[in-house]
């Protein structure tokens, strides 16, 4: 703000100048900044866009003009100078209430969390030229980041559309197993002062197996499901195997195993997996973010907020989209003194996709012949990816792709934010900034055995801690079961009765995931009431049919 000067324009309104090297740049008109702002707003034509992105705040005159002209639009203002924004907050508080003002990528994420992405219809960009001219690279970078984050939110929404019904189905079927299952919350804070190891299925995992075997009594070893077969084939036991995948193919990670591990499964995980493993822990995925007012907000997996009203808290784990990222948050919650990444190549080290010994290799072996071996199959897969070269831990470069590089960015960002050291022991894999590269053997040799071993802590919790309480949940589900039958019976004939049933909070919670696409379509189109009623009836009947099929499998548990 030291380079900015506020003066009075000829119209009597405040105006703003930027002084640099003896040169004065006018941020607003020296004659009438209000009229100037109206002209700027007139140049903006968002068409169908629902969000207007503005580069440059100034004193906010153009923001007021925009909001007056487009009152239903969301406005996000990118501003480089935090002190200027604070001055506007003090002198023009009404401007601050009209838009979200962001200075960095983290604040972009916070601003987007307050927007219902389901109503998103595109963005329009308005560049406040005087502000932009001061820091063009900053505004270009921030605009690109904002668009990237919006794309990510849309991708999340599409994922939800694709998998939400499956998630709800799996949650309900897994609820049958909850009364014999430990909530992950019981492990939080129980491993203080102990290192935590995340074992992933990258190609370099095979090089760390000897050291990993020596770490069993010294560190909490959490293995992602993809890597478990590799460890078992080398007689290495992790303390916990973690799975998140809702799809049935995830059972391939466990077919043919001789030792059933302690399974930590997200409640959306495939019931085929959770039924296969006797000793298990359930967790739920949730996302925490800071709202513009500074409060912490929580966004949970569909249905789980409602479920936990009856079962009590199961325990949240935040995820960056992969099992390894969830394991990272688990170790933080467990209280580990450091986090060690093993097999986290985030690259095609040695031009391989996974470590040898995963189910992927098992699937490919029958397809090999003297003309096509595993190396050829790996190469064919890699060629289909959008690849790039990144620095490797061995001093050279290594091939990665767009998705793996996104995960690398996640680990780099997370390692920077946590207060404990993060070690990358992955030889040959991608360099992960904000972590320290150390061979696993060197770490294991330095560690001392704790007084109480990781396995002893887990054994105690499994034998002494209460499992998840489900009696109240199944009493409620039994009541809903009758309402679903009623819904199916009246949906086609009695519109008023149909809407009354759907207005019930419990029914809405269960039916909405199965009606989401229809509700989204209705929200985005200007339909007459008759058409809306017809769509709602069809969607409600389909939801009732699907839920009743699920409830039939829960029949014995219903009270």
What are these regions, as identified by a protein language model?
Residues 76-82, 225, 242-245:
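Conserved acidic E/D residue at the C-terminus of a beta-strand in Rossmann-like folds
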Residues 85-164, 232-328, 332-334, 521-559:
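Acidic/Gly/His-enriched mid-domain segments of enzyme catalytic cores or analogous surface patches
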Residues 227-228, 235-245, 331-355:
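Glycine-rich phosphate/pyrophosphate-binding loops
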Residues 51-106:
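SAM cofactor-binding core of SAM-dependent methyltransferases
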Residues 1-51, 59-65, 170-184:
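Class I S-adenosylmethionine
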Residues 320-324, 371-428:
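Polyanion-binding loop/helix "lid" in catalytic or ligand-binding cores
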Residues 405-406, 415-559:
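Long, compositionally biased charged/polar accessory segments in the mid-to-C-terminal portions
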Residues 97-99, 242-246, 255-260, 283-284, ...:
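Acidic, Ser/Thr-rich peripheral helices and adjacent loops at domain boundaries
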